[in-house]
Curated annotation (Swiss-Prot):
Name of protein: Endoribonuclease YbeY
Keywords for the protein's UniProt record, in alphabetical order: Cytoplasm, Endonuclease, Hydrolase, Metal-binding, Nuclease, Ribosome biogenesis, rRNA processing, Zinc
Cofactor: Zn(2+)
Species of provenance: Chlorobium phaeovibrioides (strain DSM 265 / 1930) (Prosthecochloris vibrioformis (strain DSM 265))
SUPFAM superfamilies attached to this UniProt entry: Metalloproteases ('zincins'), catalytic domain
Cofactor: how and how many bound: Binds 1 zinc ion.
Positions that bind Zn(2+): H105, H109, D115
Main function: Single strand-specific metallo-endoribonuclease involved in late-stage 70S ribosome quality control and in maturation of the 3' terminus of the 16S rRNA.
Lineage: superkingdom: Bacteria
Length: 148
């Protein structure tokens, strides 16, 4: 199992905790990672990726690229540290908690979960909350999150 973290910013990241979060989600969901690249970047890079690959010209917290289907996981995901910071303020959570949440969310996408409908978003949010609790990261209020 290969999990590579890449930080394109100058901000220090809790790499051990991030890898632990990735492994936890994979283990609990029955997944096996062949290769996962997690790229933590700034807002400009994320917006460019979102526009170039998805045709969306706006900021987002994560973009995932699954290269496999099912529980054998190969893929990459990008996380905008700028957007994580904004979300941490918006949802009154700490930066690290929000970073872990978005990382968990990204791995769930690699495993095939979607968040296109309110029901799907709710299901993913419940899983994120569960994994944050297991990691000891706590959970911020999810009332406002249910709207996004």
């Amino acid at each position: 199992m290969t999990i590579q973290l890449h930080n394109t910013t100058r901000r220090a990241l809790p790499e051990a905790k991030l890898k632990k979060a990735v492994r936890l989600v994979l283990s609990e969901e029955g997944g096996k990672a062949v290769s996962i690249d997690a790229i933590y970047c700034g807002g400009r890079m994320m917006r460019r990726i979102n526009r170039e690959f998805l045709g969306h010209d706006y900021d987002t917290d994560t973009v995932t690229f699954p290269y496999s289907e099912g529980l054998v996981v190969e893929g990459e995901f990008y996380v905008s540290l700028d957007e994580v910071g904004r979300n941490a303020v918006r949802f009154k959570s700490g930066f690290e908690q929000e970073l872990l949440r978005v990382t968990i969310h990204s791995v769930l996408h690699l495993l095939g979960y979607d968040d296109a409908s309110p029901e799907e978003r709710g299901r993913m949010r419940q899983k994120e909350d569960r994994y944050l609790r297991i990691l000891g990261a706590g959970v911020s209020s999810t009332e406002e999150r249910s709207q996004v």
